[in-house]
């Protein structure tokens, strides 16, 4: 859950997001070390008049500043590729949900259940109850079982949209005529908020996403009440 003046990421609620946070810290450490070294060398050049004449045209120095950046790039690329393939891998999902973007609301269809589909609109500010979040609440939440591999099929019926839930590390484009897929697994119950992340018209900022993760038994009871 996000909070005012937040500088960092939201708490991870999926294995993919946990991997992304680790990769962010890994990359940030490398950037910090490189920046510190560069700033140190610049300050040294500005505060001293020493010149290393023996290294002005040295084959060893040129070799080092060629090989070292290559090693650093490999250290960044390998974990990045690993996460990329993890995000694309979908093995035996137990539930499939089809998401369609519209101007300016979402439609959800649970393909494993007959006639289980609904539209999800933002709750107007005037209709909010105490404690509810402005521009983030919807009339119909996406209820999903926790600790279950779920496949999301995402598309659009009009213009480009983007189905995004930051705490789950999800951001998938909804493109007319194309069906994209994403996988999600939540490690804990709760409400997780997102929004359309592709400018799609005048009401682009009024397309919130609310995922309610519940235990499997509660999900079964919900599907029974909806069908």
Curated annotation (Swiss-Prot):
| Location of this chain's protein in the cell | Mitochondrion inner membrane
Q: Binding positions for Mg(2+)? A: 198
- Provide the membrane-side ranges marked Mitochondrial intermembrane in the record: 1-14, 88-227
Which residues bind Cu cation A2 per the record?
196, 198, 200, 204
**SUPFAM superfamilies cross-referenced by the UniProt entry:** Cupredoxins, Cytochrome c oxidase subunit II-like, transmembrane region
Residues crossing the lipid bilayer are 15-45, 60-87
Q: What domain of life is recorded for the organism? A: Eukaryota
Stretches in topological domain Mitochondrial matrix: 46-59
Q: Which cysteines are joined by disulfide bonds?
A: none
UniProt: Cu cation A1 binding residues = 161, 196, 200, 207
Note the PROSITE patterns from the entry: COX2, COX2_CUA, COX2_TM
Quote the cofactor binding remark.
Binds a dinuclear copper A center per subunit.
For activity, the cofactor(s) needed are: Cu cation
Q: What is its main location?
A: mitochondrion
BP GO terms, sorted? ATP synthesis coupled electron transport
- How is this protein positioned relative to the membrane? Multi-pass membrane protein
Which GO terms of the molecular function aspect are on file? copper ion binding; cytochrome-c oxidase activity
Q: What class of enzyme is it?
A: translocase
Provide the assembly information: Component of the cytochrome c oxidase (complex IV, CIV), a multisubunit enzyme composed of 14 subunits. The complex is composed of a catalytic core of 3 subunits MT-CO1, MT-CO2 and MT-CO3, encoded in the mitochondrial DNA, and 11 supernumerary subunits COX4I, COX5A, COX5B, COX6A, COX6B, COX6C, COX7A, COX7B, COX7C, COX8 and NDUFA4, which are encoded in the nuclear genome.
Q: Which NCBIfam families match?
A: CoxB (TIGR02866)
Q: What does this protein do?
A: Component of the cytochrome c oxidase, the last enzyme in the mitochondrial electron transport chain which drives oxidative phosphorylation. The respiratory chain contains 3 multisubunit complexes succinate dehydrogenase (complex II, CII), ubiquinol-cytochrome c oxidoreductase (cytochrome b-c1 complex, complex III, CIII) and cytochrome c oxidase (complex IV, CIV), that cooperate to transfer electrons derived from NADH and succinate to molecular oxygen, creating an electrochemical gradient over the inner membrane that drives transmembrane transport and the ATP synthase.
Family, similarity comment: Belongs to the cytochrome c oxidase subunit 2 family.
Annotated protein name in UniProt: Cytochrome c oxidase subunit 2
């Amino acid at each position: 859950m996000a909070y005012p003046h937040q500088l960092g990421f939201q708490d991870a609620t999926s294995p993919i997001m946990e991997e992304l946070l680790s990769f962010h810290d890994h990359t940030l450490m490398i950037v910090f070390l490189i920046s510190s070294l560069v700033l140190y060398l610049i300050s040294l050049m500005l505060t001293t008049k020493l010149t290393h004449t023996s290294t002005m045209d040295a084959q060893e120095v040129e070799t080092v500043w060629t090989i070292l950046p290559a090693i650093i790039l490999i250290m960044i690329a390998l974990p990045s590729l690993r996460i990329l393939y993890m995000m694309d891998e979908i093995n035996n999902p137990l539930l499939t949900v089809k998401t369609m973007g519209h101007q300016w609301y979402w439609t959800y269809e649970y393909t494993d259940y007959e006639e289980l589909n609904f539209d999800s609109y933002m709750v107007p500010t005037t209709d909010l109850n105490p404690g509810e979040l402005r521009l983030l609440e919807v009339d119909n939440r996406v209820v999903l079982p926790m600790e279950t591999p779920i496949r999301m099929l995402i598309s659009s019926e009009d213009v480009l949209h983007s189905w995004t839930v930051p705490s789950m590390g999800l951001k998938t484009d909804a493109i007319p005529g194309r069906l994209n897929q994403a996988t999600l697994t939540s490690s804990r119950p709760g409400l997780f908020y997102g929004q359309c992340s592709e400018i799609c018209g005048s009401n682009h900022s009024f397309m919130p996403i609310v995922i309610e993760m519940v235990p499997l038994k509660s999900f079964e009871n919900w599907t029974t009440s909806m069908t």
